[in-house]
């Protein structure tokens, strides 16, 4: 077993401490702290459970070997227990492999149109709907924070917040973190009169959302905050007050807009959360070469040559070029049936992490 005993001892102690804290009513007077503790407990529970099963199986194996020394009828039981111990040992090693520290986090997701004009914007809207439907299948909450629509109702740019409702160790980020990159579509555009298949692209950016804005250092003096009237599809005004908020982080030039909440105060709070997520991602890029390489796989410019996935409508085929995944159920995928693809991406990521360990 590759993990050191001290690591297990530390995790067992942390698990016991969290169990004690979660039984304390005072903790639940602070919902954010309770949720954070609950998520960590959910992360540790299967590890602790597997470790205890392994210890019990080892004791049973030792007993069976002692009995088999005097009675051959126990030989088969020894073989079964040896197999179980090996299986649990491997399972525990997998659980202790390096894990993304943001896996339990919620996300901010941006879709942007690129090459292809109106068709690209329509495809960007298709991607946004795909993610919304996937989130709905999992009981997650989706909020459209900002949207810039095209003449035909597509998305030039849209920002979504996707949040889970439970304390699962595998949160929204663990499932959707691989979506960042350029997505290419091959189909006959609605604007095409000759029936020819065109290729266009849209981009997706995904950021883990911090539990609290305070977790990310943001100096108020570094912010320029502008307010304006919210607008609906096609640029039509839907609010007679200046409730929309645009925040510019002057040192980095990052701009975040939020206009879909009901009040200026709510829009400002959500915009700050999105800004915190983006600044956190930038800080991690600078701090870690690995994180920088991962983020490099996301879009810098929406260029078809940087594609991570192709959606081929004539063949009803989806292809993820990073892992060679192919499936002929594009219609179902666009309706939010993404679990098979996400499972394959997660398995490839897990294998990579085990190799690093």
From Swiss-Prot:
Protein name in UniProt: Peptide chain release factor 1
Localization per Swiss-Prot or TrEMBL: Cytoplasm
GO molecular function: translation release factor activity, codon specific
Tagged with keyword Cytoplasm: yes
SUPFAM superfamilies cross-referenced by the UniProt entry: Release factor
Record NCBIfam families: prfA, PRK00591.1
Organism: Mycobacterium avium (strain 104)
N5-methylglutamine sites (modified residues): 236
Source superkingdom: Bacteria
Main location (coarse class): cytoplasm
